[in-house]
Regions:
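Single conserved hydrophobic/aromatic residue that forms the stacking wall/gate
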Residues: 1-6, 10
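Glycine-rich phosphate/diphosphate-binding loops that line cofactor/substrate pockets in enzymes
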Residues: 89-100
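HTH-adjacent hinge/linker in prokaryotic transcriptional regulators
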Residues: 12-13, 17-88
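Glycine-rich phosphate-binding loops that contact phosphosugars or nucleotide phosphates
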Residues: 98-216
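Short, hydrophobic-biased amphipathic alpha-helical segments
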Residues: 74, 216-220
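Conserved adenylation A10 loop of the ANL superfamily
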Residues: 223
Length: 224
């Protein structure tokens, strides 16, 4: 199913039934569902941990259990990121970061907050990293970018409309761009030159989502 085209699935079930099923699971449609399924299958092959990445602790857990689960989750996320890391891709990403005079971060909500840590680390080594919190500011930023800029676009699903809109502007202007996204086909990777993949243990629509995997990828990029 994860590798099946929508047209193949629709031969066995009506399109309306498939869409209803996907939306019942809180996905926008079949493609979103397929991306999440492929990502989760990839994670399942690599992970032996019983910790739920979306809800790593319960209200009844002790302080030690909470701290231990978060520590183990962060370690596992970094380990899985390293296992999945394409070293040649990382080398090319680092070259792009080194060459750029200005690095612009694009995304919404949580990933932007985590990107602030990356911004601070890069500031310490003399790199100009800019983060606009408002979507309209990001679109203006994309429209004003030059060849001296590098765009890093963060979207776990690779289908975040605001990020896709910025990616299209950057693509038309031929601005170098890197995607940070989950495994599987998605629209975002079509508009970027390089891709770094996230650990897929955190589901797209989770309440405690993507903090450890995004942070680990930022950290890997910073330290190489």
């Amino acid at each position: 199913l994860a590798s099946s085209a929508a047209s193949d699935v629709y031969k066995r079930q009506s399109p309306a039934s498939i869409v209803r099923f996907c939306r019942k699971l809180e996905y926008e449609g079949y493609n979103d569902f397929k991306i999440a399924l492929a990502a989760q299958l990839q994670y399942s092959r690599l992970s032996n941990d019983d910790i739920n990445a979306n809800y790593p602790f319960k209200g009844t857990d002790s302080v030690y259990t909470v701290a231990s689960n978060i520590a183990n989750l962060s370690k596992e996320s970094i380990d899985i990121t390293m296992k999945n890391l394409d070293l040649e891709e990382l080398r090319l990403v680092v070259l792009m970061i080194t060459k750029a005079k200005v690095i612009d971060i694009y995304g919404v909500s949580g990933p932007l907050r985590i990107a602030s840590d990356f911004q601070y680390k890069m500031f310490r080594i003399g790199k100009d990293v800019r983060i606009s919190q408002m979507i309209n500011e990001q679109l203006f930023q994309a429209a004003q970018s030059t060849s001296e800029h590098l765009a890093i676009l963060i979207s776990y699903s690779g289908e975040t409309e605001e990020v896709i809109e910025a990616a299209k502007i950057l693509y038309r202007r031929k601005i170098p761009a890197i995607a940070i996204t989950s495994f599987g086909e998605n629209r975002l990777v079509k508009y970027t030159q390089r891709v770094l993949y996230l650990n897929s243990s955190e589901f797209i629509y989770s309440k405690i989502a993507t903090f450890s995997s995004t942070l680990s990828l930022h950290s890997v990029s910073y330290t190489h």
